[in-house]
Amino acid sequence: MPTPGRCSSAVLLIIDGLRPDAIRPDTMPSLSALRDSHWSTSRAETVAPSVTVAALTSLATGVGPGTHGLIAPGLRSLQRLRRLTPLLTHLRRHRVPTRIAVGAVPIPRLILARALIAAAGGAEIQCAGDDPASVGALALGAARRADAGLTVAYVNDCDVAGHAHGWMSRPYLDAAARCDRAVRHLATLVDGDNALLCVTADHGGGGIHPTDHDLPHPINATIPIILAGAGIRGSVRSDQPATILDIPPTLLSALGVPVPASYEGRVLSEAFEAAAAAA
């Protein structure tokens, strides 16, 4: 199947702990509209265990926890990443810049994040304020630079609220509404910027325990993947199998960068107009 054409920039927005059923017009109008007018699946799966460190490391390396070995916060396993082909390293080899936009992060987590990012190939980290809207605005500015490349934006309001009050509780849905402000900024990219926007989550939550997500359960494992922008099909709800491991190959292919043979996911070719037309 043909690969997607090259876009000038790509943005990956990770909304930590966002369940697909929280994406509804009364809570997340911007993300709901983006999903309804572009390509999406609400049946994608994250990795096992369904925890943030394992999922983010899979996004950073293109391989599952059984290969990368990082399932809990810590610096001991970082050396294993050097034996892999991290996404950021691979992009740098192909002269594609990468930037990361995050909110206010506690110092211990920021230190761990910097160590993980350095082991995964390195990228410029920019910290915004507490409001997800500021993260979205920061990522939008990075994505519109002449040397944009890949921008990764991360917000964790849903995860914090889920652990404190329960997934799909009123505070959780309020947090989802705040995260939608980041989407509102980034959604402006999809019209005329030759940019690809991918919105996803690292895990769900509330499947067994209302305030957690680490045990095996479909609600904990199911995540949304929404693709919008350059060359993406309109108004398609996919029922084909997809996983979080498909995101790195899809981003690379959209940026015109070859996908390493070691990557365990696939390009989501069915999301792109060119591939659908040739099928």
List PLM regions with ranges.
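Feature captures the catalytic ectodomains and active-site-proximal regions of enzymes
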Residues: M1-A279
